């Protein structure tokens, strides 16, 4: 319910979900009906669609790829099972009592592991020239879990000899101010936090990073495919495919309260050599060897 309908990543997630269900013998038009809603990264639209979906009295709700989608659905119903596919801090946001024992009508798949944060910073420090000053870009209105990520970033920074700061934004103009400020600093770089705002403003962020020659690590592979520099994290389409296992179990009688929240299993590194060259940075051989995908 969070993605833009025509976004390639949103379509890949939807396809993986349908394929995963098919492998479990759930076929649309036969024994399954799926009512799709695309929130287009718009909180107001997502509230509207949440009300629509709950009014349909479905057997299950899939909160597709954002904490906000999970929250708006959870506030609408305490009875219909909800499976989330991409939430950063389900305990901190009150979606579940604990990862091991959710205890309510909500469970699903987290997109966060503490190792990710040190990896993000490490990728920036491995560049030539290395980055030493990092801004973490996000919109506080749509990133209620920002404190968790910022705390982890601040804890990882000293061991990498990096200084970090929060860069809060709410529109393209403020994104440009952040980029312009980083361009005036020496050895500066950017972490783009996972957030429906940053996903919705992906093209602007990438274009401004290119204009101001700011190296950045992005939260999803789709950013690097669209011209961003580097990505480390999970493939969201894989998480949607994994989510079908819980959907299958719940439709067969399992209770969300009894299904532990699953954490990431596989991580991928993607680098864009073309973008590195345009920005004036060199990707070290060790990082290229470790990368799962190199865009040339």
Regions found by a protein language model. Give the residues of each.
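Short hydrophobic alpha-helices and adjacent helix-cap/hinge residues
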Residues: 1-296
